[in-house]
Amino acid sequence: HPELLQGNLYSVHDGRLVLNTRQTRQEYRLLILPAGKVISAETLKRIKEFYDKGGRILATGQLPVQSAEFGRDTEITALIGQIFGIAPTRPMPAKETSAANKQEGRAIFVPAVTRETLRTAIARLVPSPDVRIPLLADMKAPADSLGGPLGVLRDHPLTPEMLGMFSYIHKQKEGRDIYLFANSTNRPVDTWVEVRGKHRLDRWDPYTGEIVPWPET
């Protein structure tokens, strides 16, 4: 919810966007701005603050050019220019563009979104990811299977084989790192996973509750 950036739920520290509530604390090094012509000026001001303090931003397809608030379109065009070095009132660049500042903030605009362009841009912005999972050849997205653009399916029913993914979530609690890996497909997954940092890992079995050291690290 972009409007949440306008309040006090999020703060910016050391190039990270920090969500800190009683229930959870989450830190984000990369903010993805999907294609769209309209954005709140207050939200974009917060995004600019994130960039000014070393944050990384990836925008795709179409940069905002209009404000959700009345009479503030000029603020939008000015802020977009300051972040990306692009005039959003003109036609979007046909090639990828990037910008950077002295605080190590970086912004990349990707005009044509594909799996490869996104993977390359994210690797440039976050060269040392929290978790790295290799591309699984047998887990293609529905659009890859049907030839549709960006996962948009036309006149095709979704079968069970097209649903699900192998994903993760990382939480920290009482000084411990907790990684939950989930396979929501109906097929087994056999792959390696790379976790940033040096850890002594235990494997927690969600079905039995068994906790055992994980020597394969």
Model region roles, listed by residue range:
Residues 1-217:
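Carbohydrate-binding surfaces of carbohydrate-active enzymes
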